[in-house]
Structures are given as structure tokens and as C-alpha cells.
């Protein structure tokens, strides 16, 4: 196994966009299992490993949960996704309080829609692209390197007093 673990970037997620009244138990379970249960279990395993390090209090540690701007707002046809991302924001806060005594910081990074091959088909639909871009005051999608830079910052000593909070990278979506 790993000799030590200092940083976890906990990133898992899926969405099945559909109206609230049409969500099946199967789809609810699929999204909850990946977006909440898997992230919980990965964090739990990582913390167990982190706590095995004898000098943890002086060495420190960081858990970075990748959530979404949707963990701070609501949106139509994204009820289950919003529910799960709000849950991880809550997990982030609870773990930050519980793990502070071990000098393990727990934060989240909450990006807006990102320009990736996975989102490309969604933005090929003009009505969806307009709906999203109309809600981002900066008028553009996020880039992966912007999220990566945030991860580097939150994992670093530059963020040594930052715990229990969310770094929202959304071009102003949640500011409205």
C-alpha cells in the first residue's frame, strides 16, 4: 500500500437530468451511490490511511471534494444532482470540524459547467447552451486548468488555514 497519504482529491459524479416527478428509484440510487456514497467511502478510506501517519498533526493533510456550483443553488431537471452536491458540501463541513484536530483540512471546489469532451454534446443543443451561458455573468464555461489550479492552491500550504469551505469557480453564477 501507500507509505503515506497527504492529499485526497475526491472527484466522482454523474447526472441524469430529468424532471423531479419523473425520477425513478433506480436513477435516484445510481446518482446517490456514485455522487454521495462513493465519495463518502473514498474519504473514509483516505482518512483511515492519513491517521496511520505518526506525525500527522505536524505534517497536515488535505481532502478536496469536487462538488459543483449546483451544490450551492438549485436548477430544473437537476434535483437529484443538486441534492447530491449539497450533501457533499455538508460532508465537507462536518469532516472539516471533525478532522481539524489532526491538522487535516477538508474543503470543496465547486466549478460551473466545464468545457470538456463530456459536456460537448450538451452544449451542441443551442437552447441548453443559451440557458447556461445566460446564467454565467462572465459569459463562458470553465476550463479544466482553472479547476486544476484551484486544487493545487487548496492542497498547498498557501491554504493552511482554509477548512470547511467551498471555492466556487463559476464565473458569477451563484453571485446572482
Where does each model-flagged region fall?
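A short helix-coil junction within the Rossmann-fold of NAD(P)-dependent oxidoreductases
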Residues: 1-2, 18, 45-60
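Substrate-binding pocket helix/loop in short-chain dehydrogenase/reductase
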Residues: 19-20, 27-32, 132
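Active-site helix of classical SDR
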Residues: 43, 84, 92
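Short C-terminal tail/terminal secondary-structure segment
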Residues: 73, 151-152, 163-176
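Residue(s) in the substrate-gating loop at a strand-loop-helix junction
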Residues: 68
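Short, small/polar-rich loop/turn modules that mediate ligand/substrate recognition or access, typified
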Residues: 100, 105, 162-164
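A conserved structural motif in NAD(P)-dependent oxidoreductases
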Residues: 136-147
Amino acid at each position: 500500500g501507500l507509505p503515506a497519504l497527504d492529499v485526497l482529491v475526491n472527484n466522482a459524479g454523474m447526472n441524469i437530468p430529468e424532471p423531479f416527478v419523473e425520477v425513478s428509484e433506480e436513477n435516484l440510487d445510481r446518482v446517490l451511490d456514485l455522487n454521495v456514497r462513493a465519495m463518502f467511502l473514498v474519504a473514509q478510506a483516505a482518512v483511515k490511511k492519513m491517521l496511520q501517519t505518526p506525525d500527522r498533526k505536524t505534517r497536515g493533510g488535505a481532502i478536496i471534494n469536487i462538488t459543483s456550483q449546483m451544490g450551492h443553488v438549485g436548477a430544473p431537471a437537476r434535483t437529484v444532482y443538486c441534492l447530491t452536491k449539497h450533501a457533499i458540501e455538508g460532508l465537507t463541513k462536518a469532516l472539516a470540524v471533525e478532522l481539524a484536530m489532526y491538522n487535516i483540512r477538508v474543503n470543496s471546489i465547486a466549478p460551473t459547467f466545464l468545457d470538456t469532451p463530456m459536456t460537448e454534446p450538451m452544449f451542441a443543443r443551442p437552447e441548453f447552451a443559451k440557458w447556461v451561458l445566460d446564467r454565467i455573468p462572465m459569459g463562458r464555461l470553465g476550463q479544466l486548468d482553472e479547476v486544476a489550479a484551484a486544487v493545487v492552491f487548496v492542497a498547498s500550504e498557501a491554504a493552511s488555514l482554509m477548512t470547511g469551505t467551498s471555492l466556487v469557480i463559476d464565473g458569477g453564477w451563484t453571485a446572482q
